[in-house]
Amino acid sequence: MIDETVLFTTSIDLSNHPMINAKIKLKKQYYLVLKYFVKKQLDNKYTNSRLIQYKEKFFNRIEIMEEESQIKNIIKALINSRFKPWKKKYKYWIMCDVALILMNDELIDKTALEMKKYMSQRQQKQFDILLNALKDNNVDISSIIFAEELMTQYRENRRFKEIKMHKYIVTANMSAGKSTLINALVGKPLLKMSQEVCTSNLCYLYNKPYEDERVHLQNIDFTNNATEKDLRNISWKTKTSIASYFRGIDDIKSHICIIDTPGVNYVLNQKHGKISQEILQQEEYEKIIYILNANKLGTDEEINYLKWISENLSKEKVIFVLNKLDEFRIAYDDIFMSINNVKKDLIIMGFENPVICPISAYFALLIKMKANGYELTDDEIDEYLFYIKKFRKKEYDFSKYYQSVYLEDGDNEIVEMSKKCGLYGLEKMLLGGII
C-alpha cells in the first residue's frame, strides 16, 4: 500500500546530482529510463512532480523528444553497455533515483528485478551490493562509492519514514500570535501572519528529513515547489498540507507534524471554534499547544474555551505558551508575578500542574530568519536590534522558566537570544522530543 504522507514529506536535493554536467543526449536517455521505471510502478501526482523536478534540473527549458518506442534499447545501452565500461555507474544512479522517488520497498524491489534482466550474472551480483546498501547502512559501499551521495539521501529518507511521527496541535484565540509561533518553530515564514483571521480550515505542517530548498503544498492543487506567492494565496476553503524542512537552532531529527487550527473567537464566523473543538476531539496527537496572549488574559471567550478544554480533553496533554510578554513594561508590569497568576488561574480551571512556556514569538521568528540567512527588511533589522537590547535585561530573560536551559559563556548571539526569548526551551521541549 502506498503511503502518500511519505511521498509528500520526502526530501530530494538534485543540486549535486552526478548527471547534471553530462552531455544533453546522455541526460535525455537517462531521464527517459528513469521516467519509464518510475511510471511503470507508480503514476500519480507525487511521482509526476518529481519527474518534472528532474527534468527541470537536467534540462532547464529544453524540451525532450519522447522516444518511448526505443526505450528498451535505451535501457540496454545504459544498464548493460559492455563496450563502454564508464557507463556502469548509470544503473546505480538510476536505481537510487527510482528509490528516492518511490520510497516504497515493494516497488523498489520490482524495479530492481526488471533492471536485472538487462544485466549479466556478474553485474547482478555487483548490483546487489547497492540494493542491500539501500536497506542496511552497515553494508560496505567502497566498490560503489560513486553512488554514495544518492544512497545517503535515500537512507536519510528511509530513516525518517521509519521513526514515529510526533503530532502537535496548536490552538488559540485570534491575535495570540499562533501563525508567528508556528513560523518561528518551523524556522521560515510559511504561514501568513495577520491580525485578521486567515485560517478557517485545518493546516497540517510536516517537516522533512533534510533541507532540499523545496516546499510541498497540497491545497486546491499540489506542487512540490511552492513559491511565496503560492503560500500567500492559500485557499482556506479546504484542508491544507505543507511540507518543508524545519530549521531549528539545533538540527531537528524528529518526525514532526504541527496542526494549525482556526482561531476560536472570530465573531464573523462562528464555525471556526467548532472546527477547532472537533479536531481536538477527533485527531490523534501527543500535545496541545495552547497559546495565550499575555496582554489579553482573562477574557470571557478565553475562560470559556479553557474550561471546555479542561472538561473535554486530557489536561496532561496541554502545554501553555504565554506569548507577547516582551510587550510588558518593567516599570509597570511584573513578568514573574504574571506567570504565577496565570498558573493559579489555570489550576482553578482544573489544570493541576500546568506547563507554562513564556516566549516572544515574533523575536523568535526574527532570530530564526537571521540565523537561516533570510534578508531582513530595514524595519525588521531595527526591531531585531531593539529586541537584542531588551532581552539583555535580566527581567526579560525567559530561560529561567525552562528546565535544563542555561546560558553559557560560549553561546553566540543567536543561541543566547533564543534561550532568553523562550524559543530554545520550547523548541527543545517539542522538536527535541523531551516532553
Where are these regions (language model features)?
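Charged, amphipathic alpha-helical linker segments immediately N-terminal to NTP-binding catalytic cores
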Residues: 73-147
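Short, surface-exposed alpha-helical recognition segments that flank or form part
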Residues: 142-145, 414-421
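Short loop/turn motifs at secondary-structure boundaries
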Residues: 404-415
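Alpha-solenoid helical-repeat scaffolds
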Residues: 65-69, 120, 312-315
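N-terminal accessory targeting/assembly segments
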Residues: 1-81, 85
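Globular "head" domains of long coiled-coil molecular machines
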Residues: 4-22, 155-400, 418-424, 428-433
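Generic surface-pattern signal
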Residues: 67, 80-84, 103, 132, ...
